[in-house]
Amino acid sequence: MSEAAGNLNSLRLANVALREELNALRGENVQLGLQLGRALAEVNSLRGNVSSYIRWPMPIVPVLAEENFEFLLNETDPTPEEEEEEEEEVPFLCWPPPRTDPEYVSDDLLINVVQDYTNPDGSSDPPLSPSPSQPELHSPMLKEPTFEFLLPPLERPDIEPFSGDPVYLAEFLMQLETFIADHEDHFPGGAERVAFLISFFTGEARDWAISVTQEGSSLHANFPRFLDEIRKEFCGPIPSRVAKKAIRKLKQGNCTLGSYADAFQFLAQFLSWDDCRLQNQFLKGLSEIFRKELLWSTEVADLDELILECVKIERKVRVPKTASLTGVQNSCCPFALIPNEDENEGVEFYSENEGEGEEAGGYRLYLKDQRQHMTAFPQEMREEEEEMRKEEDEMEDEEDEDEDEDYEFEEEDEDDDDEEEEEEEEEEEDKEEEMKNEDSDENKYEEEDEVIVRVLEPEQEQEREEIEHEHVYVHEHIHAHVHTLAAHHHGLHGELMVMDEPVLVDTSTQTISSAIGYHAENYLGVSPSVMHSSRQRSQNRVPLLEGLPGTNSSFYSPPPLMRHAGRLGQRQMRRCPSVLFCLTPRQGGHRATQGRIRV
């Protein structure tokens, strides 16, 4: 008896579990039917609005009746005995709780509306075929029935079909890979991508692709492997002359980096160029964004490292695609076009300093002008890029026309080496000329920061001392006159630098290194000079070398004035470099032979 009771309980539990599963399936069936009814009702309402302008035939609407469901309601109704058992064991779980949203329409009302939908002549539409089988109801495509309606129709790209010529294979695959990458939503699986690629094949290439990608083959749904097989099948050979022209015309444009790199490497295998030349050609074909970012990157060893560096840049600058959500049609962005512009005419934006008036920069920016600038900016960028591409193409065409008919790569490499050597020699000559010009300019205009050391004999020193004592007073007046003229030329009459003459220190033990710096002992209590902020840079042009050996006597001699013609016919006053101190061979040592000491 105990075994029979146990078997009965197990059977009863199994029956209850099966009944729960049956109820759940019936509920899912009804929910799917209601979702389909809502979608069809929305489509019919939209078409009804358009029917007043365009005479379209009325659509066929399915009637959601009881005979269209997989499980009939009268067949699954429980008997009174089963109802008693369910009340004792588990509650009956069939219908979900009713929704309380104010905008929600009840399911019964929706079914009645769809059933009452008739044609204008009064005849009701015939019902559709029964609903699909149970496995199809649980497919993921039916769980999201509104996802397909949101995808816009895909336009076929304007790409020339491929007939099997390996010369055009690289550019053909680059364009198609970019198009598929830009429209990933339309190609969710590999089979769709393979079929889309085969649709652009013609002739023998189409026959080969169809035979290779039949159902059951490994290439039917493997898009990357199918691309590799295409490159192996139509690998050439390509003449080096043709490959050279093709790789020079290859430009990335709006294509992805991966497709451009694959196309470039496919053509590079037919050339005998060295790695440096391949890198230069690869950079010429890159888009402007990558070339700008590569300026901040480190040096690369070969072409593979250059491609990897570009891949890193692509990950940084790539704009993530926004996933299309079901039921969301209008996404707001800061600069989206607003259809009703009259409402936004009064909306204004002010700058941060609007209270200071228009003279201080408080200008008003309107939304309408902002939207126009935002729409015009990409167009200007595209036009500039197109102009740059046209100029590059013209330059390359001129280079191709000027080239010799002999396309042997050894001779080309030799010519390139000779040209590079000539360019390097010219650059070196230009640099030498620039250095000479800079030295001459420095000698003319920038020798105020230099200290000239002259080697004098003991007899000449005494004569020099006498001459210097006589001309001290005259040179002081000339020095003051030069400063007034310079201030008058620059319009800085009120900004003259007031400096007191430094007191010389008789310290024979002071070295050059300690005397060059701006130390307090060089002034001996003299107050620092008072100067304007705009004249602060002038203080670095006056080296304090009063404490050097041999400078205790009045050896300082301002140079004579030099007159230079200005840009506008004005006469400018400029002083030659001044001799601040002189050294004898005994005092100068090894520095006296060089002739100059830079400060």
Curated annotation (Swiss-Prot):
Residues 78-90, 393-432, 439-450 have a biased composition (Acidic residues). It comes from the Eukaryota. Disulfide bonds: none annotated. This is Retrotransposon Gag-like protein 5. InterPro entries: DUF4939, RTL1-rel. It holds the Pfam family DUF4939. RTL5 is one of at least 11 genes called Mar or Mart related to long terminal repeat retrotransposons. They do not correspond to functional retrotransposons, but rather to neofunctionalized retrotransposons genes. Residues 77-97, 116-139, 377-450 are annotated as: Disordered. It comes from Mus musculus (Mouse).
